[in-house]
């Protein structure tokens, strides 16, 4: 990406197929220290400019991965008590709003699933998994041209691979873009 945080920490990878780009993002977490939170914001500011460029380059994008930020109140079990927690602050949620409302990316999961209690991350403390006290911080943000290609969604919880569960979006045949 030409951006130190992304490049040295392996936070973004993209594969291009014809007119379709599929990317994996691992946005920095800001929860471990003030310095990490500042580093997260540096990444977010830089990445916003990248996303704006993507919207004007004529390609379709699927950007999936751990965004380490919720978008809306529905995306976290304990919204009110986490307002000052990194990943749930008003400023971070506003950044997600900007990506979706101003830049024009689409939250593929929420496009087809408006139900609450749909989470992709649970703390390893306090039986969060067993009690479904989670956060939805994993996304597939897509360009609007892919909206009509979504045929299904799921969060895979049959096995635990980590503190995250895979977010799956099923698409119609995308070979016309490849």
Question: What is each PLM-predicted segment?
Answer:
Residues 1-31:
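Structured beta-strand-rich core segments of catalytic domains in phosphoester-bond hydrolases
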Residues 3, 28-44, 81-85:
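Surface-exposed cleft-lining segments at the edges of enzyme active sites
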Residues 3-5, 129-132, 157-159:
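Short Gly/Pro-enriched turn/cap motifs at secondary-structure boundaries
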Residues 9-14, 136-138, 164-168:
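Short hydrophobic/aromatic beta-strand or adjacent loop that forms the aromatic wall/cage
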Residues 15-18, 143-144, 169-174:
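Active-site beta-strand termini and strand-to-loop segments that position acidic
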Residues 43-133, 137:
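Metal-dependent phosphoesterases centered on the DNase I-like endonuclease/exonuclease/phosphatase
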Residues 151-178:
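Surface polyanion/phosphate-binding segment centered on an Asp-His-Pro turn
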């Amino acid at each position: 990406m030409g951006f130190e945080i992304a490049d040295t920490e392996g936070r973004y990878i993209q594969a291009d197929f014809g007119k379709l780009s599929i990317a994996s993002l691992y946005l920095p977490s800001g929860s471990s220290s003030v310095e990490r939170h500042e580093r997260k914001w540096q990444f977010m500011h830089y990445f916003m400019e990248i996303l704006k460029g993507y919207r004007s380059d004529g390609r379709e994008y699927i950007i999936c991965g751990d965004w380490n930020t919720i978008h809306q109140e529905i995306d976290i079990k304990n919204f009110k008590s986490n307002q000052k927690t990194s990943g749930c602050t008003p400023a971070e949620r506003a950044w997600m709003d900007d990506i979706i409302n101003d830049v024009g990316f689409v939250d593929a999961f929420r496009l087809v699933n408006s139900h609450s209690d749909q989470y992709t991350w649970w703390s390893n403390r306090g039986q969060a998994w067993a009690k479904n006290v989670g956060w939805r911080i994993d996304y597939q943000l897509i360009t609007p041209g892919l909206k009509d290609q979504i045929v299904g969604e799921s969060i895979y919880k049959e096995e635990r691979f980590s503190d995250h569960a895979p977010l799956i979006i099923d698409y119609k045949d995308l070979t016309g873009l490849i």
